[in-house]
Amino acid sequence: MFPMVTGFMNYGQQTVRAARYIGQGFMITLSHANRLPVTIQYPYEKLITSERFRGRIHFEFDKCIACEVCVRVCPIDLPVVDWKLETGIRKKRLLNYSIDFGICIFCGNCVEYCPTNCLSMTEEYELSTYDRHELNYNQIALGRLPMSVINDYTIRTISNSPQIIIK
């Protein structure tokens, strides 16, 4: 055959192949158009956190025996434990306990190794402030229970698990 005719045949085949690829990509795009959106509208919708979510640490002052295990197991020596030795009863008395959440890596070692279970992880994750010094929580701030996302009537909660529709 003539080289010009073969060139036109190759060009025609390439054009058909390109149109097929564009059509396949367009079909994939159309199949995604029917799906629900993945993103959530954050201030008005919130995800329900899992049971094992590691949020802000909750501290119970009455249970703490000032053993400082939490300080020893913390990779960055973060919790500040101030105590005084009571000579009459030969026990430590806790004076102050604080954690700076601007530095905390939320590893959960302090909660896991606490012998009296005075530390626990909450589902609170909204810790943003304009001043980093406000992230230093003392025992009073650590003792406050966070408001649950489920109980907040102004917010629509969205489950983390994928929705299964049974037909």
From Swiss-Prot:
Q: Which UniProt keywords apply?
A: 4Fe-4S, Chloroplast, Iron, Iron-sulfur, Membrane, Metal-binding, NAD, NADP, Plastid, Plastoquinone, Quinone, Repeat, Thylakoid, Translocase
Q: Where does [4Fe-4S] cluster 2 bind?
A: 74, 104, 107, 110
Q: Mind listing the GO biological process terms from this record? A: photosynthesis, light reaction
Query: Which cofactors are required for activity?
Result: [4Fe-4S] cluster
- Name the catalysed reactions: a plastoquinone + NADH + (n+1) H(+)(in) = a plastoquinol + NAD(+) + n H(+)(out); a plastoquinone + NADPH + (n+1) H(+)(in) = a plastoquinol + NADP(+) + n H(+)(out)
| Residue stretches making up the 4Fe-4S ferredoxin-type domain | 55-84, 95-124
Q: What is its main location?
A: plastid
List the EC numbers from the record.
Answer: 7.1.1.-
Q: Quote the subunit structure annotation.
A: NDH is composed of at least 16 different subunits, 5 of which are encoded in the nucleus.
Q: Which family does it belong to?
A: Belongs to the complex I 23 kDa subunit family.
- What is the role of this chain? NDH shuttles electrons from NAD(P)H:plastoquinone, via FMN and iron-sulfur (Fe-S) centers, to quinones in the photosynthetic chain and possibly in a chloroplast respiratory chain. The immediate electron acceptor for the enzyme in this species is believed to be plastoquinone. Couples the redox reaction to proton translocation, and thus conserves the redox energy in a proton gradient.
What's this protein's name?
Answer: NAD(P)H-quinone oxidoreductase subunit I, chloroplastic
**In which organism is this protein found?**
Eucalyptus globulus subsp. globulus
